[in-house]
Amino acid sequence: MQSAWANPILLLVLTTLIWAGHSIVGRLAVDQIGPMTLTCLRWGIALIPILLTARPALRRDWPVLRTHWRYMAAMGALGYTGFNALFYVAAHRTSALNLSIIQGAIPALVLIGARLFLGARFTALQGLGALTTMAGVVAIAAQGDLNRLAALAFNGGDVMMFIAAILYAGYTIGLRERPHVSGLSLLAGMALAAFITSVPLMIWEIAAGGFIWPTAAGYATLVYVALGPAFVSQIMFMRGVELIGPGRAGVFVNLVPAFGAIMAVVILGEPFAAYHVVALILVVSGIAIAQRGSGGGRH
């Protein structure tokens, strides 16, 4: 266990596998548990191990967190509640393959958002990478059909997933203004905010008649998303960044759409069309080009 905890490659590959598996589980959750119920209970359950793990750090950082409660609430609502709620609704309307590939656009959206709203400069390679990635998303949305693109006749689930990606990109940009606290304290604060802000969504789902009492598969899904993407992967990613730095650790995001596509085909038996091949190549290549343009591990 000690050697595994000191192996950044293993930790980061496992992290990306968990993230990729999120798309698969999102599809498996359809008709097994309501999307807003899944979002709310995910953070409610995840809070338990997160708070237990972060307790020493929270004692130290609590005065700072308390003065930044508005920031914590906004970030939890945007990056955790908003992203997850849209993600799970999108999973009802599109394939896990599309969910995985569209998620791959998040790094490009971060670059674009930082340029538009913060005036951040990026290199020619980063710009090329962002454009290449977005071309992959367009290929998915149009399903390889130029007529569909011209008519703007996109799948609603793909559009929702893209909006979710925009929200998460906004959350990522917002992390630049994070208070000076430990990563664990930040995770705990935003997870608490996510749970609180997702409760009204679950109440709305119940009131609107959309509540689905979880099946056995629904409970299994809930356990996976609460302990996997919401907790274990976050801890492993923090450790990976600690060992090799954020620049080199960021390269591993390339694996998420690739792993997700493979899982969607192998586990769910989803069809892998020619436009999926083109989109996957464009998205992964775009991420790699942008990463190279950022100077890799120097940042």
Which residues does each predicted region cover?
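Glycine-/small-residue-enriched transmembrane alpha-helix faces in small-molecule transporters
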Residues: 1-40, 148-177, 197, 298-299
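Helix-helix packing/entry segments at the starts of transmembrane helices
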Residues: 39-41, 80, 98-105, 173-196, ...
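Transmembrane alpha-helical segments that form core, pore/gating elements
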Residues: 50, 110-112, 116, 146-208, ...
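Hydrophobic/small/kink-forming positions within alpha-helical transmembrane segments
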Residues: 20, 24, 76-81, 85, ...
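Specific transmembrane alpha-helical segments of multi-pass solute transporters/efflux pumps
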Residues: 17-25, 51-103, 139, 226-244
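Membrane-interface helix termini and inter-helical loops of multi-pass transporters
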Residues: 24-32, 89-92, 141-154, 203-217, ...
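Specific alpha-helical transmembrane segments that line the substrate/conduction pathway
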Residues: 37-48, 78, 84-121, 125-127, ...
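Hydrophobic transmembrane alpha-helices of multi-pass small-molecule transport proteins
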Residues: 50, 113, 122-144, 198, ...
